[in-house]
Curated annotation (Swiss-Prot):
Lineage: Eukaryota, Fungi, Dikarya, Ascomycota, Pezizomycotina
Null allele phenotype: Impairs growth on L-tyrosine as the sole carbon source and affects homogentisic acid and pyomelanin formation.
Keyword Manganese: no
Cleaved signal peptide residues: none
Protein name stated in the entry: L-tyrosine degradation gene cluster protein hmgX
Amino acid sequence: MASGTTIQPSRPSLTSNDSAVLQALFDAESSPSSAVAIDPSLSPFPEYLHISASDHESLKARELSIIRSLQSDDVSMDTITSAIRDLDALITEHPTYPSAYVNRAQALRLHIEKTAEASTDPEEAIFTPGNTESASRLFSDLGQAISLCTPRSPADPVSTVQARILADSHTHRGYLLLKAARLKKNANGNEMVGGPDKLRDMGPDQLEEMASRDFFFGGRYGNKVAQQLAVQTNPYAKMCGAIVKEALRKEVEGVI
């Protein structure tokens, strides 16, 4: 009687370089460039913004007095509108103060979601035609905050204040880009009729790549959620993942 033979599926062999590439693609924290030097001893903002530490304290106090009014669970439209006007004035007086742009973007988003029709998902209200102007302002504010806070050289360290603003702004913008990408996909290629003007003519894949880039930078500056979203939206990670899955499938099928 013949003895039974068990066929063991072979395990795909990866070189150390292959493993390193896969790790870098799928692990948001594995790459040496995935983090930046955050120096708590630095002044809140770089010198070229002309905001001293004492200026920052007074601006922060004024800003906090504005945004505290928005902390209520059922904040009124009048309160939101008033806060946006106050932030407008603050930005007009101090156009290089990045944090005010971040908070005005938040206030604009709150205003948009508050005015959403009952039949509209509040998180999708920003992409309705009636909110195009506000959505464009919101997107512009996030871009301005990022532009002001981004170090002139990638090797330059950033302050804890800079890092927080960059993490928040990149993550917020990445979320909006990802939302726009998914809405475009659901529209089956039809043009998005609302949302920020800059995004109107972009395709879903381009929007998702931009979102991935923003999540990458949000993660670099310390946002843990952005780190994970950067991996999930990374087109190269997706492509590599598909290749690996296909190779594994063929490897298994070849020995059965």
